[in-house]
Amino acid sequence: PDDSPMAATVDEKLRLSTTNNHTSAHLMHEALRQVLGEHVTQAGSLVNPDILRFDFTHFEKVSVEQLEEIENIVNSVIRDNIPTDIFETPFQEAIDSGITALFGEKYGDVVRVVKISDFSEELCGGCHVKATGQIGQFRVFSEE
């Protein structure tokens, strides 16, 4: 093995864009549940600096009106500039209190929770904004 020193840096611009999209995924998940119903669950996602793709379960195509309502809900939460609260708690306590977890995901005994006021509360280990106002305008470009 080579013992040469290495230097690593965080690309702040890349991190910020990815962080904005990641928190947006949480907001979109809850907006989908509010508009389409509590049966909606996340089935996958792609979060990168340029785009957010959110895969979810639902039994029919989402209408243009529903997409507009989802977009409006997310943008309202962004405009409200709600602080993001991140904390750790025992897994079973989180589940018992109704915090959203991904089905089939493996979690440890202690989990990290991302809470955005009373709007969204999910288990998550990713990077998030300090307050929703940092995200900027949210747009839905397509639904397939």
Where are the regions a protein language model picked out?
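A glycine- and charged-residue-rich anion-binding loop/surface
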Residues: 1-144
